[in-house]
Structure formats: C-alpha cells, structure tokens
C-alpha cells in the first residue's frame, strides 16, 4: 500500500504565537508557506471532531474572512461528495453565500471583482 505524508512545521514566537507556517507533502516534492491552516480529524472513539486552527500574525482580517468563506464552500463540496446529500450541501452553500454577503466578499449574484471598493 502506498503511503503519503503531509508535514507541518510551525515556528512560534516567545508567546507561542505562530510566526511562520510551513508545510510539505511527500507527493509534491516542495515546501510551501501559509498564513493559516485548519485541520479537522475525526476521533472514532469519542465520535467527535478534533481541530487545529492556526494563523500567523501576518494574516490580515480581510484574508481571514476570505479564508473562512472559502472553507465553508469547500466543506459543502466535500460533504456532497462524501454523503451524496445534495440538498444539505445546497443549504451549506446558501449559508456560505449569505456569510460572504454579510462580510462583503460576494454580491447577491456573485463575487465582487478583485480590487473593487466593495
């Protein structure tokens, strides 16, 4: 059986705040940096989700808003693929749309153009 590895290296300041997030994947053969990471793991014994959410001081609030919005949309897509629950995934996308509108990331009929004043 083939195995792949994903590795995260987090550099912390003296207050244990992430300064730098680096990650690599054995299949990608390169190392990348990121300002934020969200990891969710299913604990079978506890039947609960374990979460690791980290972001650096360099992550701007507008970037964080976009990061969360895109995660909501990605979760809807993954949920639909994993469960076949089309209607529930639509409801998740609808929530993500309203969330994006509230944060002025998207208009009622789509995304604001990049660089717009919203």
Task: Give a label for each model feature.
Residues 1, 28-31, 113-118:
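Intrinsically disordered, low-complexity linkers and terminal tails enriched in Pro/Gly
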Residues 1-8:
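Structured beta-strand/loop patches that form or line metal/cofactor-binding pockets in enzymes
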Residues 12-13:
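Short, acidic, Ser/Thr-enriched surface-loop or helix-capping motifs
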Residues 19-84:
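Active-site- and interface-proximal helix/loop "cap" or "latch" segments in soluble metabolic
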Residues 77-118:
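C-terminal charged interaction modules
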């Amino acid at each position: 059986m083939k195995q792949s590895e994903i590795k995260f290296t987090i550099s912390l300041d003296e207050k244990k705040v992430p300064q730098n997030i680096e990650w690599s994947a054995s299949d990608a053969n390169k190392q990348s940096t990121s300002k934020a990471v969200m990891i969710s793991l299913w604990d079978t014994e506890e039947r609960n989700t374990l979460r690791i959410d980290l972001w650096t001081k360099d992550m701007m609030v507008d970037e964080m808003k976009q990061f969360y919005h895109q995660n909501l949309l990605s979760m809807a897509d993954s949920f639909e693929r994993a469960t076949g629950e089309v209607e529930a995934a639509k409801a998740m996308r609808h929530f993500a749309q309203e969330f994006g509108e509230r944060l002025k990331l998207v208009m009622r009929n789509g995304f604001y153009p990049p660089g717009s004043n919203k």
